[in-house]
Amino acid sequence: MKKKLVLAYSGGLDTTVIIPWLKENYDYDVIAVCVDVGQGTETDGLEEKALKTGAVKYRLVKCEDEFVTDYIYPIVKAEATYEDKYLLGTSAARPLIAKKLVEVALEEGATAIAHGATGKGNDQVRFELTVKALAPNFEIIAPWREWNISSREEEIKYLEDRNIEVPMKKDDSYSRDKNLWHLSHEGLELEDPANMPNYERLLKLSNTIENAPNEGQFVELEFEKGIPTKVDGKTFSPSDLVKYLNEIGGKHAVGIVDLLENRVVGIKCRGVYETPGGTILYAAHREIEHLCLDRETLYFKHVVSHKLTDLVYSGRWFTPLREALCAFIDSTQQTVTGKVKLKLYKGNIIPAGVTSPYSLYNQSLASFTTGELYDHHDAQGFITLFGLPLKVNALMKEQAKKMGLK
């Protein structure tokens, strides 16, 4: 009886090639597993395709809501952003996908896991660190690090030589990754940073800014302890909430990012990301958080968020440090509750009002009039003490100058 292997299967070019390649080079029965984190219609017909390509079994694991509640909401609460732009769409999904692969492998009695991540990319790190954390004795097979195929054109020829249907056209070979949170695009004209992306051809979730409506749209979000609970007064499941925001955000060209990023392995790459719903959630969360958190907590939370972002991006989700940082973030979110109103207009998100029962904004303190809580004369003593180190330093310099010291 052959040993079993679980393959992270998307039905795209890479994993379509991997099934026959594994059969030719390894003595395993291949179980193709698609983890549904919001790919939509991309999962249609995958079972037939996988079996026809040589898999002995196909499994579809649906986990959209789990993806949002356990992986997306933590990064929303942290407002985790890689290199000032990237909202971790692929980074947050990979640990969950790898976790589900391990679970299926254990159920099926498999002893190995294979993936289609390239030897130059981040995903190989994310997949394999997760497997090592959850199933340290599993064998991991990464065909891109073993075979002599070096391009997408060679992959296409490999399939054509074996009379296997190619799941893409040669003239439309963007490398895309779609989930509930975002859609990424790489390849073609994007490989040269001098080129402007062909947005008319590229975008799938969003309008171009030129094609976005000429009238803006208001959207109101409600948060409880940092987690979105309602949009425009309506309650949604976690996945449906993101889908709804994707729809209205995409309509108004919100969340389109062109990023030159530094991969974990040290290579610079370029990608265009569409994250319409996520961009709205980050903007709304930021508004209410600035209303409800004090300066010291807010500033230190930025430090924690930066480190958390690094852990998530580099595949270190299942680590004690990531859990500890998320626990800190959660502790800061106990008062991040209230309503935020935003206006969406041609790629812009414009704050239009925020309220919270835990607001730290005091109108009488913020106004120019003198109130009971604050006397303008109090500022003199504060400035004297706050500026004392500056004064002492200046006096020292004057004294040194008089003494002829430099």
Swiss-Prot record:
L-citrulline binds at residues 86, 91, 122, 126, 175, 184, 261, 273. Its EC number is 6.3.4.5. The keyword 4Fe-4S does not apply. CDD domains: ASS. GO terms for cellular component: cytoplasm. Gene3D superfamilies: Argininosuccinate synthetase, chain A, domain 2, HUPs, Single helix bin. It is an enzyme of class 6 (ligase). One of its GO terms (biological process) is L-arginine biosynthetic process. InterPro entries: Arginosuc_syn_C (IPR048268), Arginosuc_syn_N (IPR048267), Arginosuc_synth (IPR001518), Arginosuc_synth_CS (IPR018223), Arginosuc_synth_type_1_subfam (IPR023434), AS_cat/multimer_dom_body (IPR024074), Rossmann-like_a/b/a_fold (IPR014729). Pfam families: Arginosuc_syn_C (PF20979), Arginosuc_synth (PF00764). It is found in: Cytoplasm. GO terms for molecular function: argininosuccinate synthase activity; ATP binding. Pathway: Amino-acid biosynthesis; L-arginine biosynthesis; L-arginine from L-ornithine and carbamoyl phosphate: step 2/3. Homotetramer. Belongs to the argininosuccinate synthase family. Type 1 subfamily. NCBIfam families: argG, PRK00509.1. This is Argininosuccinate synthase.
